[in-house]
Design a protein with these regions (language model features):
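Short linear motifs at secondary-structure transitions and domain/linker junctions
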Residues: 21, 52-54, 89-93
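A short secondary-structure junction signal
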Residues: 15-18, 55-56, 126
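Fold-independent oxyanion-binding glycine-rich loops
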Residues: 7, 47, 119
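Glycine-rich P-loop/Walker A and Walker A-like loops and their local beta1-loop-alpha1 context
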Residues: 1-30
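Short, solvent-exposed loop/turn segments at secondary-structure junctions
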Residues: 10, 49-50, 83, 122
């Protein structure tokens, strides 16, 4: 699995598609589709969006994602970096940001490579 992370609107998707020769048909958008609809697409967009539904169900996102990581061994995951902006106002928003941070850390630990994209430029972290 390869992980690409970065801030909002920094070109993560375009970077992934160009550098890993992926097309629109290779994309699964976790912000728009339930995870159960994943059908082998190699590029998983908005992986951080998987966290909130699990939290709302009282589940632990870092546990829930484990079976999926085995299925995604050949996938490229894109996730948004959190924690570099304003502190969220509500306790629920702070809990979500913290959970996404732990989730991204787990993804990075499990990934073969980790790249950070800023201004459309990739930097290899792992």
């Amino acid at each position: 699995m390869k992980l690409i992370l970065g801030g909002y609107a920094n070109g993560r998707t375009a970077y992934a598609m160009q550098n890993y020769q992926l097309t629109e048909s290779d994309c699964f958008d976790a912000a728009a589709e339930p995870l159960a609809r994943w059908n082998g697409q190699r590029l998983i967009l908005h992986a951080e969006q998987l966290v909130n539904p699990w939290l709302e169900q009282g589940k632990e996102p870092c546990t829930e994602i484990l079976p999926w990581l085995e299925r995604w061994q050949n996938a490229v995951l894109i996730t948004q970096e959190v924690g570099c902006g304003l502190v969220p106002v509500t306790p629920q928003q702070r809990q979500l940001r913290e959970a996404v941070g732990h989730f991204n850390k787990l993804l990075a630990e499990c990934a073969e490579t980790v790249e950070r994209v800023c201004c459309g430029l990739g930097m290899q972290l792992k």
